[in-house]
Amino acid sequence: MENRWQVMIVWQVDRMRIKTWKSLVKHHMYVSKKANRWFYRHHYESPHPKISSEVHIPLGEARLVIKTYWGLHTGEREWHLGQGVSIEWRKRRYSTQVDPGLADQLIHMYYFDCFSESAIRKAILGDIVSPRCEYQAGHNKVGSLQYLALTALIAPKQIKPPLPSVRKLTEDRWNKPQQTRGHRGSHTMNGH
């Protein structure tokens, strides 16, 4: 039988970021109990030697599986020391990979209190609204003016330690796009 390759997206991450992620997940699973339905699988429980941990997050009938890897081929930079993260959405026999932003939104939908757009309607109707959003990483857009006014009125409470964000885990701190100068600031265009 011929070899079959399966390609998957693995986000290159430095090991300190993975260590922080694991620590936050364990804290919110066992101490704060905000993620008590999550399941953490250690590296010695995994049959694959490159997997350093797995976090299974139930989302209704589906689940999100976040795997951290070690011992991968290093990247083009010296700090890419063979660490990585893959994010997978599974439901029964179907699975697909998702990006960190979508993963955070899915986590937000099923867990953590939110002062969301529906709070405006509830406040107008006289219902009690949740005063804050516990998981800011799950929002990827700017709210309406009414929403921004209500959030300015009710100051968000900072949670220590912060909730684990998949987007923050996979964020590239070193390769942020360079800010290019405008027409006035460009030395080559001005002939200097």
Curated annotation (Swiss-Prot):
List the residue ranges of the region (SOCS box-like): 151-180
In-chain residues carrying the UniProt-annotated modification Phosphoserine: 144, 165
Q: Where is this region: RNA-binding?
A: 75-114
Residues annotated for Zn(2+) binding in this entry: 108, 114, 133, 139
Region feature Interaction with host APOBEC3F, mapped onto this chain: 14-17, 74-79
Q: State the span of motif (BC-box-like motif).
A: 144-153
Q: Where is this site: Cleavage in virion (by viral protease)?
A: 150-151
Q: Would I find Ubl conjugation among this entry's keywords?
A: yes
Record membrane topology: Peripheral membrane protein
Region of interest called Disordered, as start-end residue ranges on this chain = 165-192
Where is the motif (HCCH motif)? 108-139
Q: Give the signal sequence positions.
A: none
State the domain notes: The BC-like-box motif mediates the interaction with elongin BC complex. The HCCH motif (H-x(5)-C-x(18)-C-x(5)-H) mediates the interaction with CUL5.
Role noted for this protein: Counteracts the innate antiviral activity of host APOBEC3F and APOBEC3G by promoting their ubiquitination and degradation. Acts as a substrate recognition component of an E3 ubiquitin-protein ligase complex: mechanistically, Vif hijacks a host cullin-5-RING E3 ubiquitin-protein ligase complex (ECS complex) and the transcription coactivator CBFB/CBF-beta to form an active E3 ubiquitin-protein ligase complex that targets APOBEC3G and APOBEC3F for polyubiquitination, leading to their degradation by the proteasome.
Task: Give the UniProt family note.
Answer: Belongs to the primate lentivirus group Vif protein family.
Extra information = Vif-defective viruses show catastrophic failure in reverse transcription due to APOBEC-induced mutations that initiate a DNA base repair pathway and compromise the structural integrity of the ssDNA. In the absence of Vif, the virion is morphologically abnormal.
Name of this protein: Virion infectivity factor
Encoding gene per record: vif
